[in-house]
Amino acid sequence: MVALMIGETGFFQKVFRAFPNSFTEMLSTQFEHSEWHGLTFWDVILPAFMTMAGTAMALSYKKQRDSGYTWKQSFLKVLKRSFWLLFLGILIYSVRDGHLNWQLSNVLTQLAFTTLIAFSVINQPVWFQFTVTILCLLIPEILYRSIHIPGFDQPFVEFHNFGSYINKSLGIHVDILHKTNFINFISSGAHTTWGLMAGQLLFSDKTSNRKFIYLLSAGVLFISTGLALDLTSITPMLKWISTSSFVLVTGGITLIVLGICYEWIDVRNHKNRLKFFTIVGMNSIFIYLFFIFIGDKWLNGYMEILCSELLNFANVPLAAGAAISCIIVFLMEWYLCYYLYKKKIFFKL
């Protein structure tokens, strides 16, 4: 969430404009989505968010069961949460570029559906859960490759694939900057379900060493399989339509990071060193809505003008002032999370 928060200010792009060199260009590129084929750091954020949501679901469900909740009661809570995720996901992008925008492909709307997929198998054995994730990957592959609609019969070409046809049929606004397909939630369901499985593993009675090995092994296997699919041109790695190779690689990366974090934080007990990050994570939904609703639409631009113009009086270049404004916005947003943390105010769906 901290990376997402700093990235949403446009900090790395503004640093590149202020200090153009190969290093800042690399950072700027990594904090932008790939144009079509390939993978950047920024592309991994959404899959990581969805995977961690599955892990959090495992913890929440365990606490509910310990408190005497039935499956039906837990399901109703999940259903309510999915409704609010869907509502907020539509609301935050309902007005864009000066007109109404019907959007069903951002992280909140996608998570609304993947949450239901993961919860549907929460009481099933591991082999069944894993089989469902494989189906999540195979179903889009079959749909994209086997359905041939004139103008939408090229499975891995932007705007000419089956997912684009569904977008058009539903009246979803798509352009060169916003070309994510609604049906991505099918393959992304694997992310949230893998997160659920990882969470159940972490809360099991297996040894910490075995948990660490399982997470790393699964991560390496997923990355290897995804890269093989991409490098052999069987299925290219495409973030925008969430191909199976993309889901496997990003899911694998997230599981490895989760395993390393578990080993370093929980097993080796370094929890106190991460307070800066956990303060943001404890209000992740709130701060996400804040920097989309307020940051993107007003605060970022306002602070850029204010800082760059004022600092220019001290002979600081406008581009450098714009980069500094991003740091100020980031610190303001972090302090807002800190204030909520100190007041014990946590926004949950």
What are these model-derived regions, one by one?
Residues 1-349:
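Alpha-helical transmembrane segments and their immediate juxtamembrane cytosolic regions
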